[in-house]
Every structure is written in C-alpha cells, then in structure tokens.
Amino acid sequence: MKELCIYSSFTLLEFSMNKKKVITFLSLIVVTLCAIAGCISPSIELANTPSVTNVKQESVQLIVSAAADLNYVFPEIAKLWEQETKHQVTFNFGSTGQLAQQIDRGAPVDLFAAANKKFVEELDKKGLIFSDTKALYGVGRITLWQKEGSTLEIKDIKDLIKPEIKRVAIANPDHAPYGVATREAMQSVGIWEALQSKLVFGENIKQTQQYAETGNVDLAIVALSLSVNKSGKWTLIPSELHKPLEQMLAIPKSSPHPDVAKKLAAFINGEKGRLLMRKYGFILAGEKPTS
C-alpha cells in the first residue's frame, strides 16, 4: 500500500509537471505568433481605449428661429458649420416678435436670433433662456429698395411723399424690429403721418421685400442684408434716423441640444461667421456705420 501510494503520488506529480510544460510551451507559441503578427501592442491599446462608438458624437438636427433679415446670410453660415461638424440646421425665419411668442409658448428651439435685443431680454426676464448665452451678433441697417427695372427716382426717404409713389411696403412695426426702425426714420423726417394711406404692412421684412418684387407696391423699406448681393436698386437710410438695430442671439431653455447650439452660436460670432455677416452689410462689434 505504501509503495502504491508513493507511485501514485509521483505519477500525479509527473502528470502535473508535464501538463504545465505543455501549457507553457503552447503559451510561448501563441505569444511568439502574436509578436510576429504585431498584435500584442494593439491588443493592449484596444483594452484601454474607449470604442469608436463611444467616442464619436452623433450628429444632431438643430432648430434655429431667426429674424427674416437673416434669410440669406444664416444659411451660408450654417452650410460652412455643417461641413465642419456634420450637424444639420433647420431654419424657422419670421418676424422677431412672432418667433419670441413661439418660444414663450415652449417651442423646442435650439437657437433664437432676434433682430432686436429687446425680445431676447424679455425672454430672459421670464427665465426662458440661458442668460449666459446672450450675445450681440450684429447691427442692422434699412434701405429704400426697388425691383430691377423700376423707373422711380428715389434718393432720400423724404421722396416717399412724391405723388408718383402710390404704395410703400414696410414691415409691421407691431412685431417686426425693422418695421419699428422704419417708423422711427419716417417720424424723424416728419413724414409718418403723411404716408399712412400709402403704407402696406408685411408680416416680416422678407415678405415686405416680396411685395416690391412682385410689383404689388412701388418700393419697400427693407433690411440692408436683403438688399446687397441681390438684383434691384437700393438707397441706404441714414442710421441716425432710427435707434440702432442691435441684434442678439441666445439659447432657449426649451432647446433639445443646448451644448451643440452653443457651438453654432460661437461659430456665428467667430471669424468665418463674422466675415459673412459683414458681406451682407451688418455692422459688427467694434465697428461703426459708414453713414
């Protein structure tokens, strides 16, 4: 029995040692093959590195409510931003007052670009926007605009009282900042009351221009940003005739994507955005009107 036990113990020990040798040998083969194939270092990196799925940020669709005077410039800015970020932007253009009402009612807007900072400030007082996102992005100007081919000789806002001018379109001053500026300019030169029978109101500054484009009115007072880089004739109205159209943007608290919206806002006020804003006639921070 004793010999049997000793034999059995040695047999088990020998088997165990042989098994360890086999495992060790096989392990060496695997390690050697991995080293040859160059898979050791990458395997370590993959173990410690988050997957591509976790790192890559999903593209989102931003909803931007913007004043109608931005109808041309903002899509150009958004196109550049989309190319750089792969995010998408959908615009809701309209009069600032009406857009502010939509946000007041809880519309899921990612970025609000107003034609007058007053509307942003009012939303801020109601606690409806992130206060730290408020930023001026430009100062607007107004022009006397006629469609291409018009034979009217208009060199000054006072010329609007001429009898040959029958109808003049302006943005509704009840909710459109550019309409307010137009009324102020007319009041400054003393023609507001005299023009009442001639005035046709557009819901926003873009619709106001369309009235003149289609010939429904003789001319329109519109944003400079809708006059430049476009066919038609226009005359700049002196900025001292009305209060500055200080335009402000902010991110509403109803925004589904506030972090991404902040990046778009920064892009608008960044180098590329400012270049395009200047192209469309906006006065930027630190600049003064030419006339």
Regions found by a protein language model. Name each.
Residues 2-3, 17-21:
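Positively charged n-region of N-terminal signal peptides that target proteins for export
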Residues 8-9, 16, 51:
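Serine residues within intrinsically disordered or low-complexity segments
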